[in-house]
Swiss-Prot record:
Lineage: Bacteria, Pseudomonadati, Chlorobiota, Chlorobiia, Chlorobiales
Species in which this protein is naturally found: Chlorobium phaeobacteroides (strain DSM 266 / SMG 266 / 2430)
Alphabetized InterPro entries for the sequence: Daa-tRNA_deacyls_DTD, DTD-like_sf
Motif Gly-cisPro motif, important for rejection of L-amino acids mapped to chain: 138-139
Name of protein: D-aminoacyl-tRNA deacylase
Function: An aminoacyl-tRNA editing enzyme that deacylates mischarged D-aminoacyl-tRNAs. Also deacylates mischarged glycyl-tRNA(Ala), protecting cells against glycine mischarging by AlaRS. Acts via tRNA-based rather than protein-based catalysis; rejects L-amino acids rather than detecting D-amino acids in the active site. By recycling D-aminoacyl-tRNA to D-amino acids and free tRNA molecules, this enzyme counteracts the toxicity associated with the formation of D-aminoacyl-tRNA entities in vivo and helps enforce protein L-homochirality.
Gene field: dtd
Assembly mode: Homodimer.
Amino acid sequence: MRVIVQRVLSASVASGDESAVHIGPGLLVLSGIAPADDQAALGWMCRKVVNLRIFDDEAGRMNRSVKDIGGEILLVSQFTLYSDVSSGNRPGFSGAAGYDIAKPLFEKFHQMVQQEMERPVATGWYGEHMQVALVNDGPVTLIIDSPTRS
């Protein structure tokens, strides 16, 4: 699993006729699923995202998590995180899990993050063309890959 975590002052996602989903201060998490991902990878990533200490404490040091500050999370699926541009100029996406595998795993990841946060977590619409807007704070942007399991 691969995620891009962005510390935000606000973020939103919209798609077609759907009402936009908005969050205040917290994390925008773009999430990609690989074919080999499993419950262990989801659990590891869930704990990592929720407990990342990337918010400032009273001394101005990154020492608080999104949960610590009572922040919000917006999860957005993004299979393009597994793009391959090593050959030619058009990206290939064979490194991403297919819809039938990835959708239930993304839904499980969403459920796990909600349980870890102990409150609702916003999300976009899996497999839909979306418009994502954010006000990045810092900016703080991290790319995180789950450990390879064998």
